[in-house]
């Protein structure tokens, strides 16, 4: 291991992802504490996240689905929020606040119904100078948006290319697991010019009240997140790491440093945390410290030494 100058502390976790400097490989996932600039800054400063992603913002104000829109299960959460948002003009001030006050990169999550709508939203948020954009082509419970686009490789490529044409910052594409072959969608994003893919969004799910017979969610069905989806996410990351040349950011069921290391060994360049933030905002620092201790104990000089390690175990 290379020796450092006296007084300088080795950083096991700091690295660059799609040109963005992260203090650690943990990122706040879209949709959790990303509604205001203040909450994004809190996650970055108090929580210790390496980067933060906003809630998904669209071309027009949207109220979302009726309540109940989120329920807790034994194995995670089931939600059908329906992409509620104030529109990009209504969110611009919050994004500007986050950019001015966050000590970590701020990524704007956006959605639309067509490639031109995605481009419109991206252009509309550019004055706030987000560090990157994350394209939500994977929400499973918003008709005409999200997975309705993300299950079509041609549309994914077109949406990605449309946004790349109007921005000069990295573009990440968040993928849905609710397809026959996620690598096909990942390849489409890469062909469109994506700088990274994010895998995965929630898995289609449903819960029914057996006393009444009614579906529990106001939208009847929704998306499952939390611990139950981690094996699905790990497999998707593993497959995408093999199929793509661009980085894969893992998300789905990460609630400990062990989960994060597993995702990284599958091929994730970084991990996003969503559902687990409801338990404690400081989980990002906890995961970062746990990964660093693991790297030291195992004798790895930095996190890149374990990225995709599972692929070498043949």
From Swiss-Prot:
InterPro entries: Aldolase_TIM, DHO_dehydrogenase, DHOD_1B, Dihydroorotate_DH_1, Dihydroorotate_DH_1_2, Dihydroorotate_DH_cat, Dihydroorotate_DH_CS, Dihydroorotate_DH_I
Listed EC numbers: 1.3.1.14
Biological process according to GO: 'de novo' pyrimidine nucleobase biosynthetic process; 'de novo' UMP biosynthetic process
Catalytic activity: (S)-dihydroorotate + NAD(+) = orotate + NADH + H(+)
Chief location category: cytoplasm
Pfam families linked to this entry: DHO_dh
GO MF annotations, alphabetized: dihydroorotate dehydrogenase (NAD+) activity
Matches recorded under Gene3D superfamilies: Aldolase class I
Localization annotation: Cytoplasm
Cofactor: FMN
Transmembrane regions listed in the UniProt entry: none
Keyword Isomerase recorded: no
Keyword set, alphabetical order: Cytoplasm, Flavoprotein, FMN, NAD, Oxidoreductase, Pyrimidine biosynthesis
Source organism superkingdom: Archaea
Gene Ontology CC annotations of this record: cytoplasm
Residues at which FMN binds: 55-56, 136, 174, 200, 226, 252-253, 274-275
Enzyme class: oxidoreductase
Pathway given in the UniProt record: Pyrimidine metabolism; UMP biosynthesis via de novo pathway; orotate from (S)-dihydroorotate (NAD(+) route): step 1/1
PROSITE patterns in the cross-refs: DHODEHASE_2 (PS00912)
Active site: 139 (nucleophile)
Family classification: Belongs to the dihydroorotate dehydrogenase family. Type 1 subfamily.
PANTHER family named in the record: DIHYDROOROTATE DEHYDROGENASE (FUMARATE), DIHYDROOROTATE DEHYDROGENASE (QUINONE), MITOCHONDRIAL-RELATED
Subunit structure, interactors included: Heterotetramer of 2 PyrK and 2 PyrD type B subunits.
Its biological purpose: Catalyzes the conversion of dihydroorotate to orotate with NAD(+) as electron acceptor.
Protein name: Dihydroorotate dehydrogenase B (NAD(+)), catalytic subunit
Record organism: Methanosarcina mazei (strain ATCC BAA-159 / DSM 3647 / Goe1 / Go1 / JCM 11833 / OCM 88) (Methanosarcina frisia)
Gene responsible for this protein: pyrD
